[in-house]
Regions:
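PRPP/pyrophosphate-binding module of the type I phosphoribosyltransferase fold
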Residues: 11, 15-132
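Amphipathic, soluble alpha/beta structural segments
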Residues: 35-41, 170-177
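Catalytic cores of large soluble enzymes that bind and process phosphate-bearing ligands
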Residues: 6-11, 136, 140
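Short, small-residue-biased leader/transition segments that mark boundaries at the very start
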Residues: 2-7, 178
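Acidic, metal-coordinating catalytic segment for phosphate/diphosphate chemistry
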Residues: 100-173
Length: 178
């Protein structure tokens, strides 16, 4: 199997570095280059997503961000990685809002741009999202219950907050689901 790399959009680099180190992977980054001379819809428009990293050719990629709002930036990054001949692309995010619906993700999946999207159930997930072939729900209920129970017993939650083994297990599941 080809090696995987962790690729991150700008922001939250500490989390991406941690995950890359836990998984023993290389890491790269896309950052947004904006036009600060004008404002469109209350924001400075993105001119380009610039890439910092090594060759991704033939490698499986993990794109990490804290949340998927519309998802456009993550899908643009996925498309840019595919243009650079990346193999499979997995999108990891804590919160999947999908504010503009699921159509763009459906199309990206159908076009081979993304392979899987993983988010947690720490916010509401629509039944439509849960039925998507490309979607994996990361159920955090057990861990929230552990945290509440541990705090209720005045114990330390540090062992619960160390996700190394759980991260390894999820990645193994991704590779065995093919």
């Amino acid at each position: 199997s080809a090696a995987s790399d962790v690729y991150k959009r700008q922001g939250g680099m500490g989390r991406a570095i941690y995950i890359a180190n836990v998984l023993g992977l290389d890491m790269g980054m896309f950052y947004k280059r904006r036009d600060y001379t004008r404002i469109v819809n209350g924001r400075n428009p993105i001119v380009a997503h610039e890439f910092l990293g090594t060759s991704v050719e033939g490698k499986d990629m993990i794109i990490i961000d804290d949340m998927i709002s519309s998802g456009e930036s993550m899908l643009e990054v996925a498309a840019a990685l595919k243009e650079r001949k990346a193999n499979k692309i997995f999108v990891f995010s804590t919160f999947g809002l999908f504010t503009n619906g699921l159509d763009k993700f459906d199309k990206a999946y159908e076009n081979g741009i993304i392979d899987k999207v993983l988010t947690t159930n720490l916010i509401y997930q629509t039944p439509e999202l849960l039925q998507r072939e490309w979607y994996i729900n990361c159920d955090m209920s057990k861990y929230i219950a552990y945290i509440i129970d541990t705090l209720n017993h005045d114990s330390s939650i540090s062992d619960l907050l160390n996700p190394n083994e759980r991260i390894q297990n999820i990645v193994c599941l991704l590779y065995t689901s093919d």
